[in-house]
Amino acid sequence: NWTIQNVNIIFPQDEEYINYWFSAWNSFVVFNSPHSKTFSILREQYLLAIERLAMSPENWDAINNPFERLAEHLMLLYGRGQIEIDDPLLKKFWNSSPIRIRSHALRFIGGSLRSTKEIIPDKTLIRLKKIWEDRLRAAKSSPNQEESQEELEAFGWWFTSGKFNDAWAYKQLFQVLQTSGKIGDVVRVLEKIY
């Protein structure tokens, strides 16, 4: 396959060619959705992109932000069952990404849930609950509680999606408020409660 044979030419990994790598990677991640076949070919590039997240500028165009799109790709791959919660890609992503990128990942899931009209399969909801509970645990044990607040605020979008059973959703909402004192999408959260 031509792509497999040329992946290291398309995405040169030497530091001297970093600008070429960013051009190819940013174009790929912004203008494509993750697919299982492509992911298996580009897994190493995903890892390299995660390692380079620290280079993400604060003022990147929000619509075409390749760093946020990387987070979206990873969440889609996880939600579809193509990577697991303990996959090295996700571990590295959660452990090394700037807080705004981690928060974006969780808001992306919540926003996607809210905009989806179809019934989401139970196995997908179980996976999503698992990743949320993992992030909540990480936030509770984080030495940087202020930073964790931003990540936890994303649960507002999950809560207002209406995709989870009320017992689980209200329990998570209570834990978020108890841990961080803040919630995103607050107006819709209040509308749902009242």
Can you annotate each of these PLM segments?
Residues 1-194:
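Non-catalytic all-alpha helical scaffold/repeat segments
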